[in-house]
Design a protein with these regions (language model features):
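Conserved beta-strand-loop-alpha-helix junction that forms the acyl-donor binding cleft
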Residues: 113-132, 143-146
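Conserved acetyl-CoA-binding loop-helix of GNAT-fold acetyltransferases
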Residues: 93-108, 129, 133
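Conserved GNAT-fold acetyl-CoA-binding loop/helix
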Residues: 30-49
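C-terminal "cap" of GNAT-fold acetyltransferases
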Residues: 144-156
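A short beta-loop-alpha structural element at the N-terminal edge
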Residues: 2-29
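Conserved acetyl-CoA binding element of GNAT-fold acetyltransferases
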Residues: 79-91, 150
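A short helix-loop-beta-strand connector motif used in the catalytic cores of GNAT acetyltransferases and
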Residues: 49-61, 70, 114
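Conserved beta-strand in the GNAT
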Residues: 61, 66-76, 81-82
Length: 156
């Protein structure tokens, strides 16, 4: 998926060393919403990023002018395939590029995997709005770490 969107390049995370470096960089400036979701799951930003990148069946990062903005990918879960994205505070400045990228990524991923799912904190209203615009259906709610998460599902 090595593409470019409005000056934001998308590259494959293709090594443990790259995952480690990206996790360190992204964790230092992670979005408040992502930090809170990770902490509710009992994970710190570096660990959550690193685990997501290294256990996924595919993982990518978005970069602008040599500064990583976000990482995203697909991991396996009991329900099938779990799509995820964790980003920095710089994501807001590059929202148009990242939304276009994720629209393409979801479309391509649904062709391969048919169904994508995950949970988003109900407090993460921006992410819920975006994923809804991309066609997500919302389902069960679960409590973890003092936060309510809602399950979303995307289907081909």
């Amino acid at each position: 998926m090595n593409n470019s969107y409005y000056g934001v390049d998308i590259r494959t995370i293709d090594s443990i060393a790259m995952a480690d470096l990206l996790s360190q960089i992204l964790a230092g400036n992670i979005r408040k919403e992502d930090r809170e979701e990770l902490e509710a799951q009992g994970r710190m930003p570096y660990g959550g990023l690193y685990e997501s990148m290294t256990t996924s069946i595919e993982a990518y990062y978005a970069i602008h002018e040599n500064m990583p903005l976000a990482a995203f990918g697909i991991g396996l879960c009991p329900e099938g395939c779990s799509i995820w994205m964790l980003g920095t505070t710089m994501c807001e400045r590059h929202k148009k590029a990242l939304v276009a990228c994720m629209q393409d990524y979801i479309k391509d991923s649904l062709k391969k995997y048919k169904v994508l799912t995950n949970y988003i904190s109900k407090d993460n209203t921006k992410a819920l709005r975006v994923i809804k615009k991309m066609g997500a259906a919302f389902g069960e709610e679960v409590e973890t770490g003092g936060k309510t998460f809602v399950r979303f599902t995307l289907k081909e």
